[in-house]
Swiss-Prot record:
<comment type="pathway">
    <text>Bacterial outer membrane biogenesis; lipopolysaccharide biosynthesis.</text>
</comment>
<keyword id="KW-0663">Pyridoxal phosphate</keyword>
<dbReference type="GO" id="GO:0009103">
    <property type="term" value="P:lipopolysaccharide biosynthetic process"/>
</dbReference>
<keyword id="KW-0441">Lipid A biosynthesis</keyword>
<dbReference type="InterPro" id="IPR022850">
    <property type="entry name" value="ArnB_NH2Trfase"/>
</dbReference>
<dbReference type="InterPro" id="IPR015424">
    <property type="entry name" value="PyrdxlP-dep_Trfase"/>
</dbReference>
<comment type="similarity">
    <text>Belongs to the DegT/DnrJ/EryC1 family. ArnB subfamily.</text>
</comment>
<dbReference type="Pfam" id="PF01041">
    <property type="entry name" value="DegT_DnrJ_EryC1"/>
</dbReference>
<comment type="subunit">
    <text>Homodimer.</text>
</comment>
<dbReference type="InterPro" id="IPR000653">
    <property type="entry name" value="DegT/StrS_aminotransferase"/>
</dbReference>
<dbReference type="GO" id="GO:0016020">
    <property type="term" value="C:membrane"/>
</dbReference>
<protein>
    <recommendedName>
        <fullName>UDP-4-amino-4-deoxy-L-arabinose--oxoglutarate aminotransferase</fullName>
        <ecNumber>2.6.1.87</ecNumber>
    </recommendedName>
</protein>
<keyword id="KW-0808">Transferase</keyword>
<dbReference type="GO" id="GO:0099620">
    <property type="term" value="F:UDP-4-amino-4-deoxy-L-arabinose aminotransferase"/>
</dbReference>
<comment type="function">
    <text>Catalyzes the conversion of UDP-4-keto-arabinose (UDP-Ara4O) to UDP-4-amino-4-deoxy-L-arabinose (UDP-L-Ara4N). The modified arabinose is attached to lipid A and is required for resistance to polymyxin and cationic antimicrobial peptides.</text>
</comment>
<keyword id="KW-0443">Lipid metabolism</keyword>
<keyword id="KW-0032">Aminotransferase</keyword>
């Protein structure tokens, strides 16, 4: 059997090793100049005013929601078709996640669904840019503006994603992820961009103990030896070891996403006559980052269930992923919100399968995946 082909693998090389050696030799390995450089680079990438690096996108979501004052009695609109961390943070703050359905073919929320879910208790809207494609953010933001409700873009899948000619996060507030499987990674990490000066200040304080400075300010520059706690906060700062990796990965992002696009286009072409149906790319002007390539495996059409297909591919040495099992079908949310019914989300959640997609895949790797799927489809 050939070596196992994972569904994702980080692309690391000599440049990343050199960046790590530089930080280790510097004498300062936690939050410091590499963080500052990463934040400046993301302001340049997105065109937004503020960037705050954090230890994870989950931590970023936590402090952003808290900085907006969201708590008990409040509602936050979110898809169920997302990673559970968003809903977990909403619940941990004492607020209520209002889960809405997604478009059946691109798996992103629509402005109409958002509008229908708004109540007097709605305090935030969280659209997800899914699998590397952008949500229709202008239309969703317009709904929020009509009602005076802030929009927090979940851009965990959107490093390199463009919408109508501009990088996701060019205005408003967006949260990126640098987790190990993302288009750019530093193992664990995230970053918030925002054009709201006061929100940026609150987030920056909350992510580091509620202080008005970070570790680099306190211990290296000595600017605030008597720094005070402004409000109780957390420890979500990003180490410079991670930030150094992220900076190198950001330099490689365009080239890496180009390779992802080449692989995705092959999948689209060479699986077109099989019963495995990919997500539909959005109709609005965009540049897809192809974080994931997802097919829907409908047993009635394919002659095999999604779970059985994943097992057979695993036996053939090919890894797959599931992004995601709908949050409202998981134990805690199923028991707390038994009334939630989201037909499009539920149909897709039971059928979606993420195929191998990462920049270091060879053409032979891609051929291997396509051949296995064609074999399993009887084509």
């Amino acid at each position: 059997m050939s070596d196992f082909l994972p569904f994702s693998r980080p692309s690391m090389g000599d440049a990343e090793l050199a960046a790590l050696r530089e930080v280790l030799a510097s004498g300062w390995i936690t939050t410091g100049p590499k963080n500052q450089a990463l934040e400046a680079a993301f302001c340049q990438l997105t065109g937004n005013r503020h960037a705050i690096a954090v230890s994870s996108a989950t931590g970023g979501m936590h402090v952003t929601l808290m900085a907006l004052g969201i708590g008990p009695g409040d509602e936050v609109i979110t898809p169920s078709q997302t990673w559970v961390s968003t809903l977990n943070m909403i619940c941990l703050l004492g607020a209520t996640p209002v889960m809405i359905d997604v478009d059946n073919d691109n798996l992103m929320i629509t402005p109409d669904a958002v509008e229908a879910a708004i109540t007097s208790r709605t305090k935030a809207i969280i659209p997800v840019h899914y699998a590397g494609a952008p949500a229709d953010i202008d239309a969703i933001r317009a709904v929020g503006e009509r009602h005076g409700i802030p929009v927090i873009e979940d851009a965990a899948h959107a490093a390199g994603t463009h919408y109508k000619g501009r990088h996701i996060g060019w205005q408003g507030t967006a949260i990126f992820s640098f987790h190990a499987i993302k288009n750019m990674t530093c193992a664990e990490g995230g970053l918030i961009v925002t054009d709201d000066d006061e929100l940026a200040s609150r987030i920056r304080s909350l992510k580091f103990h509620g202080l008005g400075v970070d570790a680099y300010d306190r211990q290296t520059h000595g600017r605030a030896p008597q720094a005070e706690v402004i409000t109780p906060g957390f420890k979500y700062n990003l180490a410079d070891i991670n930030a150094a990796l992220a900076l190198v990965q950001l330099e490689k992002l365009s080239h890496a996403n180009q390779r992802r696009t080449e692989i995705a286009q092959r999948y689209l072409r060479e699986l077109a006559d099989t019963p495995f149906k990919p997500l539909t790319v959005p109709a609005w002007d965009h540049q897809h980052a192809w974080h994931l390539f997802i097919i829907r495996v409908d047993e009635a059409a394919c002659g095999i269930s999604r779970d059985a297909l994943m097992e057979k591919l695993k036996a053939m040495g090919i890894g797959t992923g599931l992004h995601f099992r709908a949050a409202h079908t998981q134990k805690y949310y199923r028991e707390r919100f038994p009334e939630v019914s989201l037909p499009n989300t539920e149909w897709n959640s039971a059928r979606i399968c993420s195929l191998p997609l990462f920049p270091d895949m060879t053409d032979d790797d891609v051929t291997r995946v396509i051949s296995a799927l064609r074999q399993l489809s009887g084509r």
